[in-house]
Amino acid sequence: MRNQEKIFVIGHKNPDTDSICSAIAYADIKNRTTQSGKYIPKRAGQINEETQFVLNRFGVHPPGYITNIGTQVKDMDIRMSPEADKSMSLKNAWEMMQQNSIVSLPIRDKDGKLEGLITIGDIAKTYMDKTDSYLLSTARTQYRRIAETIEGTVIEGNEHAYFVKGKVLVATANPEMMKTYIEEDDMVIMGDREEDHLEAINQNVSCIIVGLGIQVTEKVIKLAHERNIVIIMSPYDTFTIARLINQSIPIRYVMKTDNLVTFSTEDYTDDIQDVMIKNRHRAFPVIDKRGRCVGTISRRNFLDMHRKKVILVDHNEKDQAVENIEKA
């Protein structure tokens, strides 16, 4: 997140005309004679009337005001995070983190504002701990995400609809036994037998998932269409489908949204160190002046901070300098 290097040219505190004009002139000379960085005049105090008159006379804008030259979060190498929204599946979030070698993924809205945070640990915990057969409906999982997770195709029904009621189960028994445990609105993972598919439709399930790339008969598709039942075809076997399917839930269901520890790009590093030590997170979201999440930082970033570069003009002693000059 670093562009052309900036070097600040600053006069002393409570600046007079000499101090302000020296900063402006020296920055201008350096910008004209070198390509090594961008030289920016700054002031360490308010401009007096005499100085303002001189600047107005020559049509020169006053330097920006700066009170502290200490290292800020924006001086760190903020790690840019890939775009991720809360509708993404756990599987896609996991793959995105693996591909980008990150352990935390900020979730943003369309304006770039932070909505939540998910970590690899959150995904692993959800996948290992959740044995609830109603998980997919509780999380309001989209059929398109389910098909994507099991590398399948929605061959009947609305892929943009959501599974909102019922449990997920594997149905391998004969049709008579299936009547005892399949309920209305369930999602059923099945084999290749047409009579099983027809019984599931008779039970008015929400979705039928067929494995091993098996082609469903036209009769089954027609009846499913009449009852608005979704049919998904996957190349995987029923065991693999059952193992993968919980990875299709949206990350909004597991992401953290409360008490998130974030930092501003304007925060000083001296002020955030204790917060980082107290909160043993691997990464912390960074928010810019416009309220957008611009990436993350970690404790490791303290090892390679970019201290501000400063040129002091019209100074006689350190006490005249801007605050934290020793850290520049």
Identify the residue ranges that each predicted region occupies.
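Feature captures the catalytic cores and cofactor-binding loops of soluble hydro-lyases/lyases
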Residues: E50, G70-T71, V170-V254, D258
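Short linear loop/turn motifs
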Residues: Y65-D75, T138-R144, F239-T240
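Short, highly charged low-complexity linear segments
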Residues: D85-S87, T153, E226
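Anionic-ligand-binding alpha/beta catalytic cores of soluble enzymes and soluble regulatory domains
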Residues: K113-Y134, R227-N228
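Core recognition of P-loop NTPase motor domains used across DNA-transaction enzymes
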Residues: A124, S133-R145, L244
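Intrinsically disordered, low-complexity basic tails/linkers immediately adjacent to helix-turn-helix/homeobox/MYB/SANT
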Residues: S137-V154, T257-D258, D267-D271, E317-K318
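Gly/Thr-rich phosphate-binding loop signature of adenosyl cofactor/nucleotide-binding cores
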Residues: T138-D196
